[in-house]
Amino acid sequence: MRERAVAACDGASKGNPGPAGWAWVVADASENPVRWEAGPLGKATNNIAELTALERLLASTDPDVPLEVRMDSQYAMKAVTTWLPGWKRNGWKTAAGKPVANRELVVRIDELLDGRSVEFRYVPAHQVDGDRLNDFADRAASQAAVVQEAAGSALGSPEPPPAPDVPAARRAPRRGSSGAARKGGGGSSARTIKAKFPGRCLCGRPYAAGEPIAKNDQGWGHPECRTVAAG
């Protein structure tokens, strides 16, 4: 059995549900990306994209090599580590007695995890000086969701493009009060609230519970993305 491999996976959905994609990346000993893959899902939810990314990663790596998987999706991690045993005992029903969502993907992941050493590690998304592998997987998944085409090292694809300058984008609303002037004018509201649950903005970046969000034409997301879309 060889030393542990380090990898990350991520999913993206532009609309939730909307055009979606998945991606995974495996690093070398210095945690530089050396092998990666991304693919389209058509129209799908964030959760389907996240689970698909994990399923593809597990299916594409050697089961005899211990694996560390870095993810920014609490749902996908808890689904296959915390909730899965109870779902199986309950005949694939939740504690509320409802059918488990995305059961086929969860079952497939459970099969791929059987008999292999996998450690899951949660990493916050889109942090300054955050996890490099998570950032790579996030960019690859987002690009796959947008272009709806497969990509990866085996295809000779270039690395996924960098994410937009988030700090600069968040400064944009300070230039004036144009956002407030749009309230009630048929567009998106300028009002912001704190998210009760984590989700993903139309830009493809996730937001955490408690983070300020605003209404846009496709749902809820970052206030700066609402401003950009309105402009």
Swiss-Prot record:
| Gene name of this polypeptide | rnhA
Give me the ranges of the annotated region Disordered.
148-192, 212-231
Q: What is the lineage of its organism?
A: Bacteria, Bacillati, Actinomycetota, Actinomycetes, Kitasatosporales
Query: Its quaternary structure?
Result: Monomer.
Q: Which domain of life is it from?
A: Bacteria
Query: Can you name a GO cellular component term?
Result: cytoplasm
Question: What GO biological process term is on the record, naming one?
Answer: RNA catabolic process
SUPFAM superfamilies registered for this protein in UniProt: Ribonuclease H-like
**Positions contributing to Mg(2+) 2 binding:** D10, D138
What protein name applies here? Ribonuclease HI
Q: Which reaction does it catalyse?
A: Endonucleolytic cleavage to 5'-phosphomonoester
Pinpoint the RNase H type-1 domain residues.
1-146
